[in-house]
Regions:
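N-terminal Rossmann-like NAD(P) cofactor-binding subdomain of oxidoreductases
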Residues: 2-191, 228-230, 292-293, 297-303, ...
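Charged docking surfaces used in two-component/phosphorelay signaling
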Residues: 5, 70, 160-336
């Protein structure tokens, strides 16, 4: 008889939480009891799972000793409040919010550093990195031993869904207002986002860097196990509902062999290489898929030691929910 596990999902009514529940069902994860949890504003709602509607309960009232593993798919404040309570009750934690530092909750991407999970003692705390860091790690993992990567420059064009349903609704509303020639009234954002790009996502610090940009840098170094890697990151808000797209430039220690790079990417897990003059897009390729699409693989215009890439993926699915569930799949033997 197949062993099952008691699973809790915190933030179950959010975009990532709902997708995570969907993936648990799609991958036939051995769930015994599924506890769906959220704040009091969402408690009482229902989320479908295996042909039934599972009622969402208030996280503040949950006894974490009932669960063996909890996915934290809500905001950082929720993780900081309830993750310690979960582990104190013997429940292991996978955090998708970025609230827990890598020294406390190792950040793991299965395609890049799955070995970190070996010998992990329960109850454990793990971090599933931000979608940008996760998907960039998937692509750089097969290249880090092949190339002398000295610097990574990345510009991440982020989808609205990264900021939740309110941001998605704001883009839809602004688009409708503009197409119908009605006055635009920004609400969630402080300015127009429809048919526009915003140069920053979040409030910058005194040095001009946003929390998302710093999170991308720290998590990518941790996952690739290259603590001294120089990384420059810029996150911009793009007017798309789902699917992040990243422009990546790698400064190398020697001239790049594009054929070798393409072979490595084509053979790597979690990657779909699009070449021969074509290129992938978030809407046309990535949304709803379980891989990172890579295209426009090329050397620098006048620098043979520069490698440029374009990559796109479903930020909610591949970049967040799927990564967390794949971690759980690797860990369930240790949860018994």
């Amino acid at each position: 008889m197949t062993q099952t596990f008691e699973i809790a999902v915190i933030g179950a009514t959010g975009t990532v939480g709902e997708t995570l529940v969907q993936i648990l069902e799609e991958l036939d994860f051995p769930v015994g009891t599924l506890y769906l949890l959220a704040g009091n504003n969402s408690a009482g709602a229902s989320v479908p799972f295996r042909g039934k509607n599972v009622r969402v309960k208030e996280v503040d009232e949950f006894d974490f000793s009932k669960a063996q593993l909890a996915f934290f798919a809500a905001g950082p404040a929720v993780t900081l409040s309830f993750a310690p309570r979960a582990t104190a009750a013997g429940c292991s934690v996978i955090d998708l919010s970025g609230a827990l530092p890598a020294t406390q909750a190792p950040h793991v991407v299965p395609e890049a550093n799955a070995h970190v999970l070996e010998g992990l003692k329960k109850p454990f705390q793990l971090g599933s990195p931000s979608p940008s860091a996760t998907n960039l790690a998937v692509v750089l993992a097969p290249l880090r031993g092949l190339l002398d990567i000295q610097r990574v420059n990345v510009t991440a064009s982020l989808a609205m869904s990264a900021q939740g349903r309110e941001a998605v609704s704001e883009l839809a509303r602004q688009t409708a207002e503009l197409l119908n020639m009605r006055p635009l009234e920004p609400k969630f954002f402080d300015r127009q986002v429809a048919f526009n790009l915003l140069a920053q996502v979040g409030t910058p610090d005194a040095q001009g860097h946003t929390a998302l940009e710093k999170r991308l840098v720290h998590e990518l170094r941790a996952v690739l196990e290259l603590p001294l890697l120089k990384i420059s990151a810029t996150c911009v808000q793009a007017p798309v509902f789902f699917g992040d797209s990243l422009t990546v430039s790698l400064q190398l220690g020697a001239a790049v062999d594009l054929a070798t790079v393409s072979r490595a990417l084509d053979a790597a897990p979690g990657i779909e290489l699009v070449d021969e003059g074509d290129f992938p897009t978030a809407v046309g390729d990535a949304v709803g898929q379980d891989v990172v699409y890579v295209g426009r693989v090329r050397a620098g215009v006048d620098d043979p030691a520069e490698l440029n890439l374009w990559l796109t993926s479903d930020n909610v699915r591949k970049g967040a929910a799927l990564n967390a569930v794949q971690l759980a799949q690797l860990l369930i033997k240790g949860l018994a």
